[in-house]
């Protein structure tokens, strides 16, 4: 079956997912109040395709809006610099096709019927900080409308952190891994991981991608333990 045939099967509803609900809670919109969310675990190529479609459309709408504003060079430069687009080329559909093994785990966070964030992890991964096995975040992204920029208010706060915490809890309780995780960070995301108190392990950096790991102590704090 070709990729185009798979996409047609997704649209027709022929392809079924094997996801299960592993968490429910509430997100905080920037406009106030609370909105319920659901985190699904499991391989779901339809959800990955939905991420590509809805997130790509959102980015296109944002850039079309910017184009109509007639910004001067300085305003345009500042506006574009405020937009996190380093992962815009990620193709979640193709990532799903290539990651069907048991050593990969998928997580999707939905609210109001839309994918708000997605995460793919690999396990086990040796810890660089402790003598233990943790997981490695292959890819983590939130929807474009959940990112700060100068011309669009972020819709929901803390979506990425919610999904990371859910994946961490799942890895400890269901995969038998030690608390903690690691990843290679895109440059624009490094400050976020530093705020999580992740440690940069320099000998595992890859060119411009810094290697971060969350220690067991900080992971337990993230999970609500002491």
What name fits each language-model region?
Residues 157:
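Mg2+/Mn2+-dependent nuclease catalytic core
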Residues 1-154, 162, 169-181, 188, ...:
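Non-catalytic substrate-recognition and accessory regions of acyl/acetyltransferase enzymes
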């Amino acid at each position: 079956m070709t990729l185009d045939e798979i996409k047609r099967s997704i649209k027709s509803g022929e392809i079924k997912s094997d996801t299960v609900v592993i968490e429910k809670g509430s997100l905080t919109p920037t406009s106030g109040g609370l909105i319920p969310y659901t985190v699904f675990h499991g391989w779901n190529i339809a959800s990955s395709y939905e991420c590509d479609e809805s997130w790509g459309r959102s980015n296109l709408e944002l850039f079309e809006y910017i184009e109509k504003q007639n910004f001067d060079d300085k305003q345009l430069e500042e506006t574009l610099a405020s937009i996190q687009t380093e992962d815009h080329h990620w193709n979640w559909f193709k990532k799903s096709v290539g990651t069907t093994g048991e050593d990969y785990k998928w997580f999707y966070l939905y609210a109001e019927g839309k994918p708000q964030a997605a995460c793919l992890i690999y396990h086990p991964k040796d810890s660089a900080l402790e003598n233990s096995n943790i997981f490695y975040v292959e890819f983590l992204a939130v929807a474009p409308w959940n990112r700060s920029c100068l011309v669009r208010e972020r819709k929901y706060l803390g979506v990425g952190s919610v999904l990371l915490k859910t994946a961490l809890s799942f890895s400890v309780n269901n995969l038998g891994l030690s608390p903690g995780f690691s990843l290679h960070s895109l440059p624009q995301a490094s400050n976020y991981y530093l705020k999580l108190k992740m440690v940069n392990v320099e000998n595992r950096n890859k060119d411009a991608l810094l290697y971060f790991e969350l220690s067991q102590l900080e992971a337990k704090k993230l999970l609500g333990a002491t």
